Regions:
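Glycine- and small/polar-enriched repetitive beta-structure motifs of secreted/surface proteins
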Residues: 1-378
C-alpha cells in the first residue's frame, strides 16, 4: 500500500505496509519505509532508513539519512541532519547543518555547519555559518550571526546576536550578548548581559555583569556584578566587582577598584583604584584617581578631587577645586568651591565658605556664610 504517494528513482522503498502520502525523488530514498506517512525525500539516500516516521521533509544528498521513526523534521542541504534517528520537530537548512544530531528535538539551524555537532540537545536556534557549531548537549541557546556561540559545547540558556557574539563561550550559561563581538572572549562567565559593539569583549570568567553601549566594560576579564551603561562606561575595568557606571565615559579608567557608583557623563571618569565612591552628575568626581569613600552629587561636584578621601559634596560645583583635602562636607551650590587642600570643614548653604582654600576645621551654616574666608581654621 503506497496510497497517494509519488516515487521516482531506483532502490527506493522497503517493505511497505500502510504508508501514505509520501513523495520520493532520487536513488535510495525511503529504502526502509514501512508505515510512515506524509514524508518528502529529494536527493540520493535522503530518508533512506526511515521506517515509521511521518511528516518529514529531506532535500539534499543524505539529508535525514539515519532517521527511522522521528517526525516533523525539515532538512534542506547536503547531509543536513544525516545522523538524526529519533529527534522530532527540527529544522536544518544548509550544508552539514545539525549533521551529528541524533535525538535532539525542536532545534533550528540555518547556515553552513550551524549546530553541526549537536547530538541530544533540545530547543536551540542557530542562524549563521558555524553558529553553535560545537554545541553537543547545551539546551535552549540562541545564536544569530556568523560564529555566534561557536565554541559552546554544553552550556544552556545563552543568547548571542551578532558576528562572533559569545563565540568563545564553552560552559558559561545564561548569558545574553547583542552586537558584533559582544562578550566574544567569554568562556565560563555566566548570566552576563552585553549589548553593543565590543561590549564585555575580553570578559572570560566574570559573571553577573551588565554592559550596554559601545565598548562598555571592554577590558573586563574576571570582574563580577558590575553595571555599565553608556559608551565607554567602565571601559578599562579588568577584575573589579560591584561597580555601577551610567553615562558616557563613566568610571572609564577604573581597573581594579570596587563598590563605586557613577551616574552622569564622565562621572568618576579617571578613577583607577579608588573604591566606595558615589558620583552623580555630569563631571562629578571626574578626575579622581585613588580617592576613597567620597560622595559627589551635582554637576561638577568634587570635580578636581584626585586622591582625597571621605568628602561629601552636594550641589552644583560644591567642593569643585578640592584636590587632596579630606573629610569635608559641603552642601549647596558653589559651596566650598575654592577649597583645594583643606580638611575637616563643614559648610551648609548656597555659596557658603566659597573662597576657602586651605583653612581647616571650620563650620559654616547658612546662605553665603563665611563666603570670603580663605585660610582661617579652628
Amino acid at each position: 500500500n503506497f496510497t497517494n504517494s509519488l516515487l521516482v528513482g531506483t532502490d527506493s522503498t522497503g517493505t511497505l505496509s500502510s504508508a501514505e502520502g509520501n513523495t520520493g525523488v532520487g536513488t535510495g530514498v525511503f529504502g526502509a519505509l514501512t508505515s510512515g506517512d506524509g514524508n518528502t525525500a529529494v536527493g540520493l539516500n535522503s530518508l533512506d532508513l526511515i521506517t515509521t516516521g511521518s511528516s518529514n521533509t529531506a532535500v539534499g544528498k543524505e539529508s535525514l539519512l539515519a532517521n527511522t521513526s522521528a517526525g516533523e523534521n525539515t532538512a534542506l542541504g547536503f547531509r543536513s541532519m544525516c545522523k538524526t534517528t529519533t529527534g522530532f520537530q527540527n529544522t536544518a537548512v544548509g550544508t552539514n547543518t545539525m549533521r551529528q544530531n541524533t535525538t535532539g528535538d525542536q532545534n533550528i539551524a540555518i547556515g553552513y555547519r550551524a549546530l553541526d555537532a549537536n547530538t541530544t540537545a533540545d530547543g536551540n536556534v542557530a542562524v549563521g555559518a558555524d553558529a553553535l557549531i560545537t554545541n553537543t548537549t547545551g539546551n535552549q541557546n540562541t545564536a544569530i550571526g556568523t560564529n555566534g556561540l561557536e565554541d559552546n559545547a554544553t552550556a544552556s540558556n545563552n543568547t548571542a546576536v551578532g558576528f562572533s557574539a559569545l563565540c568563545d563561550t564553552t560552559t558559561g550559561a545564561g548569558n545574553t550578548a547583542v552586537g558584533r563581538q559582544a562578550s566574544s572572549k567569554n568562556t565560563t562567565g555566566a548570566e552576563n548581559v552585553s549589548m553593543g559593539l565590543n561590549t564585555l569583549y575580553t570578559n572570560t570568567t566574570g559573571s553577573d555583569n551588565t554592559a550596554l553601549g559601545f565598548c562598555s566594560m571592554f577590558s573586563n576579564t574576571t570582574g563580577n556584578n558590575n553595571v555599565a551603561v553608556g559608551c565607554g562606561a567602565l571601559d578599562s575595568n579588568t577584575t573589579a566587582s560591584s561597580n555601577t557606571a551610567v553615562g558616557q565615559g563613566a568610571l572609564q579608567a577604573n581597573t581594579t577598584s570596587i563598590n563605586n557608583t557613577s551616574v552622569g557623563r564622565v562621572a568618576g571618569h579617571k578613577t583607577t583604584t579608588g573604591h566606595s565612591n558615589t558620583a552623580i552628575g555630569t563631571f562629578a568626581h571626574c578626575v579622581n584617581t585613588t580617592g576613597n569613600c567620597n560622595v559627589a552629587i551635582g554637576v561638577c561636584s568634587l570635580c578636581n578631587n584626585t586622591t582625597a578621601d571621605h568628602n561629601t559634596a552636594v550641589g552644583y560645583k560644591s567642593l569643585f577645586a578640592n584636590t587632596t583635602g579630606t573629610q569635608n562636607v559641603a552642601i549647596g551650590a558653589y559651596n566650598s568651591n575654592c577649597n583645594t587642600t583643606a580638611s575637616q570643614n563643614t559648610a551648609v548653604g548656597f555659596d557658603s565658605f566659597a573662597k576657602n582654600t586651605t583653612g581647616t576645621c571650620n563650620v559654616a551654616m547658612g546662605f553665603q556664610t563665611m563666603r570670603n574666608t580663605t585660610t582661617g581654621g579652628d
